[in-house]
Amino acid sequence: MKFVLLFGVLLVTLFSYSSAEMFDDFDQADEDELLSLIEKEEARAEECTPRFYDCSHDRHSCCRSELFKDVCTCFYPEGGDNEVCTCQQPKHLKYMEKAAGKAKKFGGKIKKWFG
């Protein structure tokens, strides 16, 4: 009985040690991957395409507005066969930003009155 108990304790100890090393390896891999993604995002953020500029070279390069990212919208001009792509803000997002701005302004007034 003592042998089985000793063997069980040894087995649990080895299992916990191996799983701890495995989790450390996963954490390190996740951390390295996260850092590389952050670096790529920062590099891409510096090279964003402003609103109403051509985004045909990279359709995911549009800049962010205050709350939302602009969208690369492509269309064919009247009487033309060439596709033109520009970074634009969809109207529903434009209205949502205006509403959020007004709510923020109104919240500031309430805070000023009662603050």
Curated annotation (Swiss-Prot):
Domain of life: Eukaryota
Main localization, broad class: secreted
Subcellular location, record wording: Secreted
Keyword terms, alphabetized: Disulfide bond, Knottin, Secreted, Signal, Toxin
GO annotation, cellular component aspect: extracellular region
GO molecular function: toxin activity
Proregion positions: 21-44
Tissue and organ expression note: Expressed by the venom gland.
UniProt keyword Secreted present: yes
Pfam families: Toxin_35 (PF10530)
Family: Belongs to the neurotoxin 19 (CSTX) family. 01 subfamily.
Name used for this protein in its record: U3-lycotoxin-Ls1p
Source organism of the structure: Lycosa singoriensis (Wolf spider)
Source taxonomy: Eukaryota, Metazoa, Ecdysozoa, Arthropoda, Chelicerata
